[in-house]
Amino acid sequence: IKLKKGRLEAEPVDSGINEMLASYGVSYQNSLVVDQYNFNTAFNMGNGMVMNMPYPFWVKVFKKNMDAGNPALDMIDNLLFPWTGSLRVEEENLGEKKASVLMSSSDSSWIQTSWDLNPRQRFMPQQSELRPHPLAVLVSGRFTSFYKAKEIPQKPVDNSSAVSSAPVPPQNETIVDGTEDAALLVISDALFITEDFARR
């Protein structure tokens, strides 16, 4: 998602890679995870008043919702996933690959499709909507390239340069059809690893 500066609103962003990810067995869902187990944060309420309150969009991932069999998670007790979407394992695209959910929200979480991030809105999910949602998925095994039998995509234009330039056609490049043994880690949130959130 893209946060709107100075406002508690967001808008969805198309990463351009979801079709490729889905072909490998995992896709990103363009919605927000809301969780009854969350982190507190302070909000400016106006007139110089600051209020500290629970914020359901700041999902708290507990140890029990992490893959106990993955040694990379051994030393982690909990994590903050702010304004996160969710992932879905695309079973029909896995083939012989294996997908493991490394982290998920609690069983008291649900999906919100609106982009209003106001902490004072009424959060009233139906009981039937509450369930865990995958936040990190590891896909491993033999991968067939998404670009197999396709034209090599052109490199994007660098719009930061003052000199305009056209897309650069690929030169002396080939596409690897696949790999026998690889791993792909997909995480639903890009902010959780940044300093401000990782140290909470």
Question: Predicted regions span which residues?
Answer:
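Acidic, S/T/G-rich, low-cysteine, solvent-exposed domains in lumenal/extracellular/periplasmic regions
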Residues: 1-200
